[in-house]
Regions:
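N-terminal catalytic or cofactor-binding beta/alpha core of small enzyme domains
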Residues: 1-129, 133, 146-147, 153-157, ...
Length: 166
């Protein structure tokens, strides 16, 4: 079973988590579901190298915002790691275990529903941040690129629906 993770102060991740949690049962801090569980954490997801010590799951899916200086609208996903200096969480020169199957399935699902997201680029982003120390597969699923998209509950709900499908 997978654990979906959203950072409380990440508007896109938190919006996706709120939507997904509606059909789940709250058990302490964990929303329990049939196919995956969900937590909302109080610290940035890029620094969540600790998550595996506290939660035992087959893999980790981080729901998050995507930011880009270009301003290009994007729905993206990527595995985590740092090929050089760790400027955004994780450890220097460490790459986490990729969640290749989920990445492939999510991208195929996005492509199948591309008309619903016609103004967005659908991309695999380069690996560039933490967490990096996880030994189970992990992936970030992101909505970009500005606060307008991150706070668009309709968009976040649509992406969350696709996450639920995969």
């Amino acid at each position: 079973m997978e654990l979906l993770i959203a950072y409380l102060d990440d508007p896109a991740g938190h919006n996706m988590a709120k939507f997904l949690s509606q059909e789940m049962t709250l058990d302490g801090d964990i929303f329990r579901g049939k196919y995956y569980d969900l937590i909302i954490i109080p610290t940035p997801a890029i620094f969540a190298d600790w998550i595996e010590e506290k939660f035992d799951y087959d893999g980790f899916v981080f729901l998050s915002k995507h930011a880009a200086a270009s301003g290009v609208l994007a729905l993206t996903c990527h595995n985590t790691g740092n090929f050089s200096e760790a400027k955004f969480g994780g450890n220097d020169r460490q790459v986490a275990v990729p969640h290749a199957f989920l990445q492939k399935t999510y991208l195929q699902t996005l492509k199948k529903h591309q008309s619903q997201f016609s103004q967005f680029q659908i991309t695999i982003e380069a690996t560039h941040h933490g967490p990096t120390a996880l030994t189970k597969p992990s992936i970030f699923i992101e909505i970009g690129t500005t606060e307008q998209q991150w706070t668009d509950t309709s968009l976040c709900n649509s992406v969350a629906t696709l996450v639920h499908q995969v």
